[in-house]
């Protein structure tokens, strides 16, 4: 989940403006206004994916009530922060995506704490998240930097496509070079055995 959710969410976040300008060229002002929201909602997507994965782990170990409790906690935080931020003239509607991000971050943190306490095989979170986070940070930097260079020689709305391609290549190369992708990760994909052999995964 982290190998897919992290780059997808980070990519949406760092290239929010360019992506929206590409999709909605006829309304640049609206696209620019929405970019702020997508910056936070892109990050929220990461935690939505992690929430689903951690909920599944807890349910598999017979702790079905914990995801319900953590979801309620996240919902309460969302309501409170939404009320405070959207009601503040300084932030107004811009507070909505921020409160959404807070909501899912809290849910995931509580789920991870519950997994560490309830699952017999204590998960090594540092080992699980360190490499994907490092690779994603480099990928996000590559995406933003390459867009900044490309936009000087290409129309703004088209510079985002090669920037995304560069980010995908950077992420893929680093994931393989640092061993973040294993044979077990690939084997479940269609033609996974063949892909694993081509990539020399063990």
Descriptions of predicted regions:
Residues 144-202:
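Membrane-proximal transmembrane or re-entrant/amphipathic helices at the cytosolic face
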Residues 39, 43-73, 83-84:
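Membrane-interface junctions at transmembrane-helix termini in multi-pass inner-membrane proteins
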Residues 12-45, 90, 94:
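Interfacial segments at transmembrane-helix termini and the short loops linking adjacent helices
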Residues 65, 72-113, 123, 141, ...:
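Membrane-interface helix-loop junctions in multi-pass transport and translocation proteins
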Residues 54-62, 112-128, 181:
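Alpha-helical transmembrane segments
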Residues 9-17, 22, 40, 79, ...:
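Membrane-embedded alpha-helical segments of multi-pass transporters/permeases
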Residues 1-14, 23-27, 77-78, 93-119, ...:
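Short alpha-helical transmembrane segments in multi-pass integral membrane proteins
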Residues 5-10, 41-49, 71-75, 101-105, ...:
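Residue-level hotspots within the lipid-embedded alpha helices of multi-pass solute transporters
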């Amino acid at each position: 989940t982290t190998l897919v959710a992290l780059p997808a969410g980070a990519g949406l976040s760092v290239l929010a403006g360019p992506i929206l300008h590409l999709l909605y060229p006829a309304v640049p002002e609206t696209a620019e206004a929405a970019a702020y929201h997508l910056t936070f909602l892109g990050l929220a997507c990461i935690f939505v994916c992690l929430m689903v994965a951690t909920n599944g782990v807890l349910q598999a170990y017979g702790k079905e009530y914990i995801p319900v409790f953590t979801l309620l906690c996240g919902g309460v935080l969302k309501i409170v922060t939404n009320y405070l931020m959207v009601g503040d003239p300084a932030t107004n509607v811009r507070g909505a995506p921020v409160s959404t991000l807070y909501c899912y971050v809290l849910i995931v943190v509580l789920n991870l704490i519950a997994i560490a306490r309830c699952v017999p095989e204590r998960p090594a979170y540092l080992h699980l998240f360190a490499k994907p986070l490092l690779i994603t940070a480099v990928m996000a930097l590559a995406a933003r930097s390459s867009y900044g260079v490309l936009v000087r020689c290409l129309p703004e709305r088209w510079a985002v496509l090669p920037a995304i391609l560069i980010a995908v290549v950077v992420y893929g190369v680093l994931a393989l070079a640092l061993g973040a992708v294993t044979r077990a990760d690939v084997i479940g994909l269609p033609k996974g055995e063949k892909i694993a052999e081509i990539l020399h995964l063990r």
